[in-house]
Amino acid sequence: MKNKLCLITGGGSGIGRATAIKFAENKVDTIIVGRREDALAETKNLANDNSKYINCIKADISNEKGINKLYDEIDEKFDNYVNILVNNAGSSSQIRSVAHIPKEQWDQVVNINLNSVYLICQKFMKNMIKNKNGTIITISSMAALKPGLLGGAPYGAAKAGVTNLMGAINSEFSNDGIRATSIMPGEVDTPILNNRAKIPNKNERDTMMQPEDLAEIVFLTSNLNNRTNIETVVVNATYKRDVSEDLNAAKNKIK
């Protein structure tokens, strides 16, 4: 992983935090991005002796202006270009049903889970293409394959879109040395679960995949020889829990 510079969105918690720590453990210069400086600082502190490899940048990547500002700041501070991009930032709606979700919740979920990924890929791919080397890894979701109330209508639609976007990048730019991977996990014990109508309890969360499990997959994918690309990864918890109460709660939450 020499001469690598990794950018991770949503690095202040969950999968993004675990991934940043994993890359730092492997001595990879890593930039974590998020809206909360305190959360980013906590990620850096949790890396302990490897914290020197983690760089924190407070940024709003929900719009093109924020992404352009982030790009300019990285370009100014670092000699290397971002050659590993991990699109991890995401959000879900409180109302999951397509029949009841307000447009503002729909727009917010689609914007952060799909539109911002398109914008940040477009911006940072230019240097990857120029240098004939780049890896883009996007945390999609099992909701892309199995839409329903557990993830919610806008979340599933956005994740299906972003999975297709990674395929489009591979189709167009693989011969330019660009690799794009879509990782589609089932339930992972992260703060996004707190947006559900029925918030999973500790026992339920203990059966789920943990952020560090996904971090292992992200690192493995990025660390493969450049001649090899894992285009899609579908990963689930070994234990299949009963989610009927979760689905019922989501169905009944209409405001």
PLM ranges: what are they?
Residues G12-G14:
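Conserved glycine-rich cofactor-binding loop
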Residues K58-L70, K103:
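The beta1-alpha1 cofactor-binding region of Rossmann-like NAD(H)/NADP(H)-dependent oxidoreductases
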Residues R96-V98, Q105-D107:
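Substrate-binding pocket helix/loop in short-chain dehydrogenase/reductase
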Residues C121, A158:
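Active-site helix of classical SDR
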Residues S141:
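Residue(s) in the substrate-gating loop at a strand-loop-helix junction
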Residues K146, A168-I178:
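Active-site-adjacent segment of SDR/Rossmann-fold oxidoreductases
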Residues S182, K202-N248:
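C-terminal helical subdomain
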